[in-house]
Amino acid sequence: SKGIAACPKHFAANSQELRRMANDSVVDERTFREIYTTGFEIAVKEGKAKSIMSSYNEVNGVYANENRHMLQEILVDEWGFDGYVVSDWGGSNDHALGVMNGSHLEMPGTGKSGMRDIVRAVKDGTLPEEVLDQRLDELLNVVFATHQATVDGKGKKFDVEGHHALARKAAEESVVLLKNSNNILPLKPGTKVAVIGDFAKTP
């Protein structure tokens, strides 16, 4: 009703941060169900979550974003999930296989190589076009259900500068000083500070 879709993450067995983009969570089915997916099951069945973010890691030798057992057999077939699966940032390893096995949206985008992989897979028959169409339909169902698109096709206008100002204000007001070594703060008037990096230009 508020135009928002919840997105629980990271599905699933993302149990450590060290080498999480490459590690393999080897886990038996009972442990996987009872420990690693119960929270997601509740979010889908009771919370009606419309989006799930897949994790970087492999689960029993298959990357989560391409894992049919997780994305189709458990998430859709058993739990009745009717939303879309989004990869973690750069978390798609095999673009076509991800689409084939239940992934919908790749972040931050497929890029040229990803698009070429998907087109090639459709042309050689490893990714049926109807599966690609189905993923698009499933994704658009959430877009329309959350009123993120308008019927007249004009789309919504966003106040980029206003949103930027709000984000900056939120960041400024949420800063917490944990340590003040040698009483360096507050800075004395006239003190020079070097701000380096992307956020120096656009805070």
Tell me the role of every PLM-derived stretch.
Residues 1-203:
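Glycoside hydrolase catalytic-domain context in secreted enzymes
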